[in-house]
């Protein structure tokens, strides 16, 4: 497969991935952690990186810290003014990097003769509506904090159905370098598109990324073009659905980290 790397702005029209579905990301007001002290962070949902646009339904979202190889969920609070979800973690060990994770169990979204509606295909058909398509969007985000050059935890695999895992230690990456990541789809190597960008690159425009490439056999290389809070994104659409509920399952995943 021919690999394409584009360093200039990409405003991508993703025909297979409708624009009405937001991306799930994690951001913190301050990336510096202190051991044993509360660390605030947010789950954001938006088309623009990384500009919050809406508060997701709390019952569908989980967010927290990875400790001892396990996900420890935090209490979530809707922040209507900030258009995000607030949560707090308390890291116990800062000898290695700290991973925060967030997931959204997406609802079935149906396109009907009366417009877009949230719910199962069978329920709308029972109401006499014509359902043109029914898709479910599950989303995952993983953010790495407190990285160091001797860190061994940055490559921890959380176990998302679609997950981006750094092969290169983010602490070793500088502007002009490439970071290598492996991408797993249900535990197997992912082949497909990969997007990357950083906070402040193009906050005015939706679906706009600083870099594009393609993963081959589960591996992708992204050139870092600026310091800051970076996000690498992968997406898999068209997975088998559940009869009567939705036709296709679509997965989105973000890896987030700081480049100093």
What are these regions (language model features)?
Residues 8-16:
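Bacterial N-terminal signal peptides
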Residues 17-21:
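Sec/Tat signal peptide C-region and signal peptidase I cleavage site
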Residues 22-79:
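Start-of-domain marker
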Residues 56-58, 187-200:
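Short, ordered, surface-exposed loop/turn motifs in non-cytosolic proteins
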Residues 81-85, 208-228:
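Glycine-centered loop-to-beta-strand initiation motif
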Residues 103-112, 238-244:
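Short acidic/polar inter-strand loop motif in beta-rich domains
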């Amino acid at each position: 497969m021919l690999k394409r790397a584009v360093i200039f702005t990409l405003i991508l029209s993703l025909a297979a991935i409708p624009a009405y579905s937001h991306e799930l990301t994690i951001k913190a007001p301050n990336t510096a952690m202190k051991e044993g002290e509360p660390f605030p962070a947010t789950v954001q949902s938006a088309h623009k990186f990384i500009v919050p646009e809406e508060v997701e339904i709390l019952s569908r979202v989980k967010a927290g810290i990875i400790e001892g190889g396990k996900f420890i969920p935090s209490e979530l609070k809707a922040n209507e003014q900030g258009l995000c979800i607030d949560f707090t973690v308390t890291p116990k060990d800062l000898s290695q990097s700290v991973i925060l994770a967030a997931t959204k169990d997406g609802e079935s979204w149906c396109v009907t003769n009366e417009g877009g509606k949230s719910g199962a295909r069978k329920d709308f058909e029972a109401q006499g509506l014509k359902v043109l398509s029914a898709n479910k969007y599950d989303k995952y985000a993983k953010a790495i904090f407190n990285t160091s050059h001797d860190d061994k935890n940055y490559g921890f695999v959380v176990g998302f159905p679609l997950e981006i895992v750094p092969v290169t230690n983010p602490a070793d990456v500088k502007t002009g370098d490439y970071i290598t990541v492996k991408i797993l789809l249900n535990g197997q190597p992912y082949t497909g598109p990969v997007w990357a960008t950083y906070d402040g690159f193009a906050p005015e425009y939706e679906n706009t990324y600083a870099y594009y490439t393609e993963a081959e056999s589960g591996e992708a290389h992204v050139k870092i073009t600026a310091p800051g809070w970076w996000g690498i994104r992968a997406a898999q659409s068209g997975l088998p659905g559940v009869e009567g509920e939705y036709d296709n399952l679509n997965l989105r995943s973000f890896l987030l980290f700081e480049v100093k």
